[in-house]
């Protein structure tokens, strides 16, 4: 089973046990030692890739400085706070984020894909969030571009999703707010980032569409189209 939602030992780090070991072997050994140290942990029974982002990062060999945001004090905060920091780690050392160490991947943008809560008789619909400054109140990305360009991405994505849903499946699909709000997944990334609340997972009318594989394809295509518009 998978270790999930369990307080991590303060001393654990994703570093090789031996300099002679390949990195992949070291990560496997560290992960096995962690599980052995948590013999009484409750396991989720789920594949690692659908557990919390915090645990996916840990068992993928991402440095603990990325995923252990609260120094093992709060898994919930670690989970959402680490996602934008992980984006910065991926882009670190590239033209997109040249001033931080990382994997050198020149990312164009970041998407945090969520469903929302809320119940009503009709469709709850789609909300999207961006943030015009980061934790240090910077209003520009490392590239020099204004962070307000994240609003363009948010507008493209929300518009495309709502228009496609209305045209193909649900003329009543609701376009909710486009918010400049301080959420970690919109605020932390050093590339244009949006947080999408596609629909309400509590609302039967929304989930009638959310469980339809045809709708899922349409939504995925709409997101893809919006990224292309933004990049070009």
What positions do the PLM features span?
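Short regulatory "switch" loops immediately downstream of catalytic or recognition motifs
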Residues: 61-63, 88-95, 129-136, 162-167
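Active-site-adjacent substrate-binding region
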Residues: 146-179, 187
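Glycine-rich, acidic and aromatic/proline-enriched surface loops and short helix-turn segments
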Residues: 51-63, 159-163, 187-192
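Active-site-adjacent mobile loop/cap segments within catalytic or ligand-binding domains
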Residues: 110-139, 168-232
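Metal-dependent peptidase/peptidase-like ectodomains
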Residues: 43-57, 112, 124-158
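Second-shell loop/turn segments in exported
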Residues: 35-44, 69-77, 98, 139-148, ...
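Catalytic-core regions of hydrolytic enzymes
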Residues: 1-124
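Solvent-exposed, polar/charged alpha-helical surfaces in well-ordered, non-transmembrane soluble domains
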Residues: 51-55, 85, 89, 151, ...
């Amino acid at each position: 089973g998978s270790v999930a939602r369990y307080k991590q030992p303060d001393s654990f780090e994703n570093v090789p046990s031996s300099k002679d070991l390949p990195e992949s072997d070291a990560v496997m050994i560290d992960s096995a030692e962690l599980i052995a140290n948590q013999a009484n942990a409750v396991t989720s029974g789920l594949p690692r890739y659908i557990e919390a982002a915090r645990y996916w990062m840990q068992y993928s060999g991402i440095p603990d400085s990325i995923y252990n945001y609260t120094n093992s004090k709060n898994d919930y905060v670690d989970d959402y706070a680490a996602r934008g920091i992980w984006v910065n780690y991926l882009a670190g050392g590239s033209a997109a984020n040249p001033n931080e160490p990382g994997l050198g991947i020149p990312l164009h943008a970041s998407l945090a894909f969520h469903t929302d809560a809320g119940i009503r008789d009709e469709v709850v619909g789609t909300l999207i969030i961006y943030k015009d400054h980061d934790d240090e109140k910077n209003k520009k990305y490392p590239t020099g571009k204004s962070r307000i360009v994240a609003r363009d991405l948010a507008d493209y994505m929300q518009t495309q999703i709502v228009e496609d849903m209305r045209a193909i499946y649900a003329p009543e699909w609701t376009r909710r707010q486009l918010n400049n709000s301080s959420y970690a997944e919109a605020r932390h990334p050093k590339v244009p980032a949006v947080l999408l609340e596609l629909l309400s997972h509590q609302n039967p009318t929304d989930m009638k569409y959310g469980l339809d594989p045809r709708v899922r394809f349409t939504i995925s295509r709409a997101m893809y189209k919006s990224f292309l518009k933004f990049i070009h």
